[in-house]
Amino acid sequence: MDKTKTAKQDDRYFRISSFYVAAFLFAKGLELVNVDKITDPKRAQFVFKDSPEREILVKNYNFTKEDSPKAMIDARKFVMAIKMLKDKLYQDKF
């Protein structure tokens, strides 16, 4: 999990650079508000609107057993999330 905090960052948003965790969160319905490619040009950060559910989802992604219902996701939703994130990642503007 890659959550970096600085004095300028807003607690309303969750930033993560892990592509597949971001795809999981997006497929689970979290709102993607930006893809930050400026802060670190070598590594984009996906910016989500933060919610109490987000912390639970990240924990489920990282620590539950792979066949746990908490970590399960419809394959089509996950593929669509990956496609959408890749589209947004390679767009010049969000």
PLM regions: where:
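Conserved phosphate/metal-binding and DNA-contacting active-site motifs used
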Residues: K37-D40, L89
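C-terminal basic regulatory modules in eukaryotic proteins
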Residues: Q9, F14, L57-F94
